[in-house]
Design a protein with these regions (language model features):
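Generic detector of isolated residues embedded in canonical secondary-structure elements
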Residues: 48, 120-122, 275
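Glycine-centric low-complexity/flexibility signal
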Residues: 4-17, 97-104, 124-281, 286-299
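A structural detector for beta-sheet-dominated domains
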Residues: 26, 38, 52, 69-73, ...
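Extracellular beta-strand-rich solenoid/capping regions of secreted or surface-exposed proteins
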Residues: 73-92, 103-119, 136-157, 277-278
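Exposed regions on extracellular, virion, or secretory-pathway luminal proteins
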Residues: 2, 28, 40-42, 54, ...
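Enriched but not universal
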Residues: 1-94, 282, 286-299
Length: 299
């Protein structure tokens, strides 16, 4: 299979980072994918090639892996590498290739391929992988929803992040409701044709504001006057009706928790989404390295 990527970003060759073998042809080094050896008079393709250097054997070539490049221009749904690879007609577990993010992509799942697989993950400048923002809590003291995860991997990967990887912001908490209490004077006929009066206490509902949506791709929805979350910033909370009702909390910015309702009187803000679930599977950094990561990094 021909190598499907020949990309250099910020001076870093993806082919070099993924460990493709090279040979010198007419004074120039060229990457190769297949190495054949002559055995018993016939040329045979090799799966692995080792050389002895300094008394130790070192692997210099792998030929079993499915090679790929997936370019993501931005989508409002998760990109699942395993599903995409299956769609290319490959059902094995050994892969080597590149994912290039060229827009605002909601969530990337790089699956659980073999331990000798490698994925070069490149996020271009002004591009991002982000989780969905949490929805705001409704008025009456409901909690904001949590933001969603951005990146998941149980496959070894190389990170080259010139953009942003961020969990979705948490939604803001909804403010408590209350009642406005007021008095009316009621008049009525009484003895000897006189008019009498009495004070009557009445009340009417005073509603709190809903929470704002968390930032993300897409942003979370604001409720009951709360604003929707945007790509990078959370939406403001909805206003209150007074009379000890309370405003909703602001949705969290990208990779941040949502705020609770005004003065702690109402729902709690949602938790920020995880930026990377599978950071221990990061094989190495290349180019821009980790770059701008917003949110927790686990596993």
């Amino acid at each position: 299979m021909a190598i499907p990527y020949n990309t250099t970003n910020t001076g870093t060759s993806i082919r070099d980072a993924l460990g493709h073998s090279s040979i010198k042809v007419s004074g120039n080094w060229q990457h190769i994918e297949n190495i054949n050896i002559k055995h018993s008079g016939s040329w045979q393709d090799t799966k692995e090639v080792y050389v002895k250097s300094g008394g130790s054997w070192r692997k210099v070539h792998e030929g079993e892996h499915f090679l790929f490049q997936a370019t993501l221009s931005g989508a409002q749904n998760e990109f699942n590498l395993g599903t995409w690879i299956s769609g290319q007609g490959y059902s094995g577990n050994k892969i080597k290739g590149a994912i290039i993010v060229e827009g605002a992509q909601q969530r990337v799942n790089m699956g659980n391929f073999s331990s000798d697989s490698k994925v070069y993950l490149r996020i271009n400048a002004n591009c991002r992988i982000a989780g969905k923002g949490g929805n705001g809590g409704s008025r009456g003291g409901q909690n904001g929803q949590n933001g969603q995860r951005a990146l998941y991997s149980r496959t070894p990967f190389i990170i080259d992040n010139a953009g942003i990887i961020a969990g979705g912001g948490g939604g803001g908490g909804g403010g408590n409701n209350s009642n406005c209490v007021y008095q009316n004077t009621n008049y009525f006929g009484c003895m000897k044709a006189q008019q009498c009066s009495e004070l009557v206490q009445n009340q009417s509902p005073a509603y709190g504001g809903g929470g704002g949506g968390g930032a993300g791709t897409p942003g979370g929805s604001g409720l009951d006057g709360g604003q929707n979350g945007q790509a990078l910033s959370g939406g403001g909370g909805g206003g209150d009706d007074g009379c000890e009702s309370y405003s909703g909390g602001k949705g969290g910015n990208l990779g941040q928790d949502g705020d609770g309702a005004e003065g702690g009187n109402g729902g709690s803000g949602g938790t920020k989404g995880t930026a990377i679930d599978g950071i221990s599977y990061r094989y190495s950094q290349s180019g821009n390295g980790n770059g701008d990561i917003r949110g927790s990094q686990i596993n």
